[in-house]
Amino acid sequence: MNNSLHSLSSGEGPPVILLHGLFGQGSNLRGVARALESNFTVHCLDLPDHGRSPWLAHASLSSYAERVEDWMTTHDIEAAHVLGHSLGGKVAMELALSRPERINKLVVADVAPVEYPGNHDRIIEALLRVAVRPCSSRGEAQLILEESIDEPGVVAYLMMGLARVGDTYRWRFNVEGLQAAYPALRAAPRPGAVHEGGALFLRGADSNYVLPAYEAEIGRRFPASQVVTIPDAGHWIHIDQAETFQHRVLEFLS
C-alpha cells in the first residue's frame, strides 16, 4: 500500500510546496501554483485525511508535518519553500518549528501560531449529515449543507471535496477522523519552539484569523518574520485578492 501523500507538480526551478486548508485539497491552490511555476517547481499536496491522500488513525499537526517531510524525503527534496493556507499554514509552521533544516522560506496565509476556538463545529455537523445519508446528486448534498451554512463561498469550497462513488456522492476527506482530531488541529503548532528562518505572514484585512493581538506571538515564535495585510481580502486571501497575493509571495521567495 502506498502511504505517500498525493501531489500535483508543475514548473521548473527550486521546489515550493503548497499546503491547503481544512476540508480542502491540493488543487485548491492551483492558481497560486500557476503564478509560481515559471520560476519554481511547485508541488500541490493533499494533506493526510484529505483529497487522494491516505487517512490517519490519529491526526495532529505533528503527524501531518511528519507526512509532509516523508513526502519530501521520498521525492529527494532536502529543503523547500513551503506555503500553507489556514490548516496548511499550521502544518507548515509545525514543520518549520520541528525540522527547520527542511524549510528554505516559509509563507503562512491567514493563520497564526495560536490555538483557535472551535468555530467549525456547525460545518462538521453539516458534513456528517451528508456522509451518513447517501446522496444521489451533488444538488442533494448542497441542499443539506445550505440548511446549516448560510455562506455561499463556504458551501462552494466544501462541494469541491465531493466525489462520485458508484451511484452516490461521498466526501474525499475523512469527516469522522477530522471531527475526532479537530481539537488537535486547532492547537498551536509546536509550543515553545522558535523558527529563526525567513517567514512571511499574509493576512486578509477582512478576516479575523490573524488578529492584531496575535502579532506578538508571531514575532516571538518567528522572529525573522514579517506580517503583511492585504486589503479587501477575507480568509480565502489567495482567491479574494489573487494578483496581490501572488505578487507578495513571488517577491518574498525571489
Regions found by a protein language model. Name each.
Residues 21-24, 86:
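Active-site glycine-rich loops that stabilize anionic/oxyanionic intermediates
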Residues 167-221, 226-229:
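Conserved serine/cysteine hydrolase catalytic core
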Residues 133-189:
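Conserved alpha/beta-hydrolase catalytic His-Asp/Glu region
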Residues 1-17, 34-41, 75-79, 180-183, ...:
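Alpha/beta-hydrolase fold catalytic core
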